[in-house]
Amino acid sequence: MKKNFRIEHLGRSFKERLGIWIGEKKNVTTPALWIGCQGGAIPNLTPETIEYLNPNLQFAGILVPFQYHVRDVDVLEKYGKGIDAFMGLTPNQWNVLISPQDPGIDNRHGYHTNKDISLWDAAGNRVPVNFSFYNKALQSMKPDAYVSLCDGETPRNCAHKRICKATTRTLRFLDQHIEQKSNSFIFGAVEGGFDIETRKTTAKQVSERPVDGFCLDGFSLTTSEAVELNFDNDLKQLINESVIPNLPEEKPKLYLGVCTPRIILQFVAAGVDMFDSSYAKLMTDQGKALVFQNTVSNLKEKCSNIVNESLTTQKNDTKCDPEEFDTIDLNNMRYKNDFRPIKDSCICYTCRKHTRAYINHLLATKELLAPVLLTLHNLHHYETFFETIRTSIKNDTFNKLLVLFE
């Protein structure tokens, strides 16, 4: 098995680490962010508008959920050049990661069987997917890496019997993947729901198999639950005591799903290396722009400034959104005459060219340019945050960054 990850620096505060994921197309410094796709494209962006993203940003690559291509396997097989070429992306520019389902939406539950996983296509129709079909799709899509076929339908308070079925089924799928000896890197799905002992056992079982990394799956959080998630109450014991200690340190850990900046930092502190852009996409869909503090320089000063600015806003506007420390809702008419960029210090295309007032107008008139501009800003802002995380780990100041988001 070819080694695809190395640790460059271990932080001093928790289990945070700086690493290099050695992709087929390019190497990526971790912690890293995958840009999530929907329906065969990066949401709201064409291959041309993708070029408006700052070239200095370091994304891990694109995450392509298979559920949007479940009807296209024969087409992709006939095309023969891989999913990135099919999407019209610049050759060899993007690492490609395939996951069975879209981690950024609320998929329907209750339809899996012992032999297959139910996926929902772009039209909302159910498609049963067994291992052979998923494996055929992977051969046609030619990804750099993929998440093993898995049953992650184990929400909080689900029956222990359901958890056991999910873990057994997922391990069986994983063994089938390993037998096929694909050229792509495989992230073995680690299931177990919210059951501490099952998580521990499953982590050990997956770690015994020759996989290239691990995907922490099976929390079954809705998007609204994910935004409200309290890591200390909901996940800390599961992740820090049951999962991470039972996975080998030298292999990368992946978590897919909506993550606020606070949750990202807590996952990083636990030793998780890769994430996806579901949170940025969710905020874009809601007409919100990310504004949380995301740069290395003057973090304390910036934190003070945002508190002062927020207090001033609250004094002048009794309807101030308490989440403005993280986002601003540009649907709100108080931005109708706000001619500032989304964030003064941001150098993304949107902030260099446009104002809050203009985006408020676009949202009010339901103009399709609104989600384009918000996507460009939110992806830029979110990835800049990851650059801040990487720098703080390198400089052994990660604990200070974490404190700012408590």
Residue ranges and their predicted role:
Residues M1-I22, V28-C37, N44, S140, ...:
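C-terminal extensions of enzymes
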Residues M1-S182, C303, N308-K315, M333:
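Non-catalytic, usually N-terminal nucleic-acid engagement modules in DNA/RNA processing proteins
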Residues K26, L138, G188, V206, ...:
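Conserved, mostly hydrophobic/aromatic
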Residues I35-G36, Y68-V70, P103-G104, E153-T154, ...:
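Short, solvent-exposed loop/turn segments at secondary-structure junctions
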Residues P155-H160, C164, G213-T222, L368-P371:
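Glycine- and acidic
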Residues T168, Q180-I342, C346:
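Glycine-rich phosphate/ribose-binding loops and adjacent secondary-structure elements
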Residues L171-I178, I244, E387-R390:
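Structural signal for well-ordered, non-membrane alpha-helices
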